[in-house]
């Protein structure tokens, strides 16, 4: 890695550290699902998928920044938090040396996590799959419970039967996008659907 690449990588790390610090400090404790822990979880899943999908190191760095910011908009608003997160990216990342083209790619990835997901690029597919990685994992029930708890506050959803119906409707229309997520998570997701019925 040459000096210019090292400097760029250091700036990426500073930007990531900056937003993680804000997420830890400023996300509401009532965000039982979309808390700091969710961003950490998505980061782990995104890096696992990116590795398996053979993504370049420079694209992984952009992906890491997109993951770090993907739910940062929750600091300010609940609905349309993705757009608020993109605004934060546009306001913040130029000071860390990010180009307009990089910012555009990062915002594309953030927008790809909006439900219903409509990712276009490979990186957008990776972040979309990472954001919902838990749906096909063994820990899906406790994680889903944190989302139900959050929606009781933010979406006035209180009835467990309505919650299960909402989940089934969502799960029936959801699909993973990358070959890696399809391979790793589809069977687990189908088992989860079976248990909800």
Could you say what each language-model-derived stretch is?
Residues 2-3, 27-56, 69, 98, ...:
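Divalent metal-dependent phosphate-bond-processing catalytic cores, especially two-metal-ion Mg2+/Mn2+ enzymes
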Residues 6-25, 38:
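Short alpha-helical hairpin
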Residues 32, 75, 79, 96:
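Short gly/ser-rich anion-binding loops that grip negatively charged ligand groups
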Residues 42, 60-76, 81, 85, ...:
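His-Asp-centered metal-binding catalytic motifs of divalent-metal-dependent phosphohydrolases/nucleases
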Residues 59, 91-92, 152:
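Juxtamembrane helix-loop transition sites at the ends of transmembrane segments
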Residues 92-100:
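Inter-helical turn/loop segments and adjacent helix faces that build the functional surface
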Residues 100, 105-106:
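Active-site-proximal substrate-binding core of FAD-dependent oxidoreductases
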